[in-house]
């Protein structure tokens, strides 16, 4: 469970990016975040994943206040989280399988991963996760030969093998065609349901948020102006957001 109270963030000299954002997120939820460009979506995700410090507010993760997390404590927390971006953080020359195995970096001796001496159990686990995202037949393909949607699904498998409990997906389907985007979002939704992962997913397409979000958030001017169970947004709600 994640609880955030009155999280605010500004950039000098006086540009308010986030203003008193409060929420509770429970395991198994896919929270679809929509909002205009510049509404604060990426900054919110960067704060929640401890990539950026916020100005004020309380952040509770699994019952512990982590608002002042530093150093080693922050690194330990990041083991529980994965961050997916529009352009996945993958090695293009390595195979899909080796990229997924690299997700074990935080949990295995680093030299085993880099030298390719991961165990047969590790390989089987990685293959299982590739199968889960529908890419078993692409396991030995260099990532540079995969489509944009396939790369994003490799990134999801990489997040799963490291045991991520929370996934921050920042515009993961931007630039993908509708079919490829749907496959990525199907995978994220499936992960929520089966693995009880919390997924925060920012989207440009309202129709995807309505279809896949167990909850929909609307961010406008750095404020959380809409927080509803997944359904079609009313025109009034759209007007509040956009």
What does each model-identified segment do?
Residues 178-180:
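Helix N-cap at the start of a conserved alpha-helix in ABC-type nucleotide-binding domains
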Residues 167-170:
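Catalytic Walker B motif of ABC-type/P-loop ATPase nucleotide-binding domains
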Residues 49:
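Helix-to-loop junction immediately C-terminal to a conserved catalytic motif
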Residues 142-146, 150:
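Conserved ABC ATPase signature
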Residues 113-138:
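Conserved ABC ATPase "signature" region
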Residues 203-204:
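H-loop/switch region of ABC-family ATPase nucleotide-binding domains
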């Amino acid at each position: 469970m994640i609880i955030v109270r009155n999280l605010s963030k500004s950039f000098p000299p006086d540009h308010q990016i986030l203003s008193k954002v409060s929420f509770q997120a429970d395991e198994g939820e896919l929270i679809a975040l929509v909002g205009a460009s510049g509404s604060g979506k990426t900054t919110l995700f960067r704060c929640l994943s401890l990539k950026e410090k916020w100005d004020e507010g309380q952040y509770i993760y699994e019952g512990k206040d982590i608002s002042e997390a530093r150093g080693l404590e922050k690194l330990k927390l990041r083991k529980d989280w994965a961050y997916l971006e529009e352009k996945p953080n993958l090695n293009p020359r390595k195979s899909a399988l080796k990229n997924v195995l690299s997700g074990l970096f935080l949990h295995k001796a680093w030299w085993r991963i880099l030298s390719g001496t991961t165990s047969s159990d590790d390989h089987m686990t990685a293959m299982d996760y590739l199968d889960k995202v529908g890419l078993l037949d692409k396991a030995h393909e260099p990532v540079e030969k995969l489509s944009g949607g396939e790369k994003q699904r490799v990134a999801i498998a990489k997040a799963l093998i490291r045991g991520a409990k929370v996934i921050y997906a920042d515009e993961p389907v931007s630039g993908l065609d509708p079919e490829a985007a749907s496959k990525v979002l199907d995978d994220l939704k499936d992960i929520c349901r089966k693995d009880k992962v919390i997924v925060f997913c920012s989207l440009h397409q309202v129709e995807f948020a309505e279809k896949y979000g167990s909850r929909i958030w609307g961010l406008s001017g750095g404020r959380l102006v809409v927080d509803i169970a997944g359904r079609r947004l009313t025109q009034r709600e759209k007007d509040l957001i956009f």
